Amino acid sequence: MPISICKHGAPFVVQHENRYGSGASQSSSLSKSIRHISNSHEEIKFISCYSANGACFSNAQMLANASGRPVIGYYGKINKLTASLDNSGRIFRPQHKLAANICYVGNRLLSAPVQLGFGLKHLLTCHSNGNVR
């Protein structure tokens, strides 16, 4: 039975511990957080919006590489219910070291404009006194 990780996500970006970062940078901490609770060969269901988008640069691929396990990622918006109802997930397997390193860099580069967009949105939705709407 696969273990499930549920996180907010966007293409190439994952929210973990109340901050957004590239899937590449967040995948090692996500992998460490489940290392002690399951068999090292079990699949991981990565229930996170857009976790499969980006193919080899996707957040699901980053988690597969970091954990050494197969990861099921999802295209577009997803939640626990829709993830259990359909077979829209795609399985990502850990890559060889060279490919994993290239894709790690690609994910980090592709996440930059998305993170910039989040920063601008936050900036534009702040009141002058610093409170967020």
UniProtKB/Swiss-Prot annotation:
Transmembrane segments: none annotated. It is found in: Secreted; Host cytoplasm. It comes from the Bacteria. Effector proteins function to alter host cell physiology and promote bacterial survival in host tissues. GO terms for cellular component: extracellular region; host cell cytoplasm. It comes from Salmonella typhimurium (strain LT2 / SGSC1412 / ATCC 700720). The gene is steB. This is Secreted effector protein SteB. The keyword Secreted applies. Keywords: Host cytoplasm, Secreted, Virulence. The keyword Secreted applies.
